[in-house]
Amino acid sequence: MVVRASDTLQDLARKVRICTDLGVFQSTLTHFPGINPEYAHNCEEERLLGVSMTGVMDHPVLNTVSDEAIEWLVHLRGVARDQAENTAKLFGVNVSAAITCNKPSGTVAQLTNAGTGGLHPRYSKHYVRTYRQDNKDPLTQFMKDVGVRHEPSFMKPDSETIFSFVVESPEGAVMRHDRTAIEQLEHWLMFQRHWCEHKPSITIYVKDNEWAEVGAWAFKHFDEVCGVSFLPFD
């Protein structure tokens, strides 16, 4: 689901209900001819959903660790669970074993200008977003004709083209330099504990002088850390 900066708790709850309904319906599509029947049985038994938030880092409440943010997340997780149980009864299927998550959702984030997806801050106030296009796609020639900046793909120069678009982050958006590595990790932990029934995914930007503290944090929360990767800040 796409989170907008202006969304109230009621707005987000409505989006959670809609996404959960769609997920429960999708979980009924378990006719998988040609593969191991155990796979279909597992899908029918667990009916895992993936109700995820995209645009969190642009939201004034959810982009920061606070008591208010925790209250919102706990409430929204309960909304998702209640909705899944009610909708599963209507369809006559098992209630999902896990519903809520937080994944990068890069394509959705770009299509809706909802940041960089997942729990990641925007890279900077201005940055260049690149897209890879097949040269056989009519859209490729169209974008070339209208003057979109482009260059041959380094890996496949004869068959692919890379297009570049300049992006400006909205006012008030959180940038990578606005958060320390520990602040990013604590934000991830808040979503892990109070929203996600699956594990949230995140890549943490780490400055040279932060690695020791990050290592200590990861050791302290060893039993909870999963789906976390790290990149040098620069």
Segments (PLM) and residue ranges:
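Catalytic alpha/beta core of large soluble enzyme barrels
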Residues: 1-35, 39, 45, 104, ...
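Hydrophobic alpha-helical segments
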Residues: 20, 47-49, 81
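Amphipathic, well-ordered alpha-helical segments in soluble domains
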Residues: 22-25, 52, 83
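Internal maturation/activation junctions in enzymes
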Residues: 30-37, 55-104
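A short, ordered amphipathic alpha-helix with a cationic face
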Residues: 45-47, 73-74
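Extended amphipathic alpha-helical segments enriched in small hydrophobics
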Residues: 46-63, 221
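Short capping micro-motif at the N-terminus of alpha-helices
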Residues: 97, 110-111
